[in-house]
Amino acid sequence: MVFDLGGISHFTGQNQYPVTWSVTESALLLNTCYHPTEWDIYWRLEPCDFVMRKLEREERLFSTPAITEAWAHAVMRHPLAYLQHRAAFTWNFLSGNNLTMWVADVERPTETVFSDRPAFVALVSLHDMLKPSPLFRAGTWLVLCIVVCGFAWPRRETTEGAFALGVCGSAAIYVLTFSAVGVASDFRYAYWAVLAGIVGGAVTALGRLKPQLS
């Protein structure tokens, strides 16, 4: 809800949080802070962490009905701004160049973890080479799951068809729920769709080949 309130505030140009901000904070909130990527911007990333600091520590409103009421009020008063925000997030989640592999050293943020291990360094190099490709886009795997469901539907009475429809259907629904409730765009949130698309696609293909092989 904090993320949604930030998005609606940005698209309406009006504060939707149940608190007041300084002139500087308002300018940041409405013009600078919002990115359709993750709610961490308002939680722990400077210079916009003042949002959660005020909601949670100063006003003690986080996880209270005040936030829920402010969210419901904002959505009802500004449905188009809410949809703009959710659409922007969804597009970024499905097609954006999002975080795929954590390589930063928490204790030494400027350094890469396991930099002294050749195998890991090789893995990071492969990751960097493949990251711009569709393989690391959540939308690719969502589309694959939907396509597999389309091929599996006519064979849903068979074991292979039911399996593919079950795993890929659940993965597609899971990914699509992020359009309404997602608050972060990391590629890891699409892992189920990746596994389901690969396994479901393989099972569907084998099921279609079975009559030709028998």
Question: Which residue ranges define each predicted feature?
Answer:
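Membrane-interface anchor segments at the N-terminal boundary of transmembrane helices
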Residues: 82-167
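Membrane-embedded glycan transfer/ligation machinery
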Residues: 45, 49, 170, 190
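Membrane-interface junctions at the ends of membrane-embedded or membrane-associated helices
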Residues: 153-160, 201-214
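Membrane-embedded alpha-helical segments of multi-pass membrane proteins
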Residues: 139-144, 190-200
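Aromatic-anchored segments of alpha-helical transmembrane domains
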Residues: 169-180
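Membrane-interface catalytic loops of GT-C/OST-like multi-pass glycosylation enzymes that act
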Residues: 179-193
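Catalytic cores of PAPS-dependent sulfotransferases
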Residues: 147-151, 173, 197
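Membrane-proximal stem/loop segments at transmembrane-domain junctions that anchor or position
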Residues: 1-113
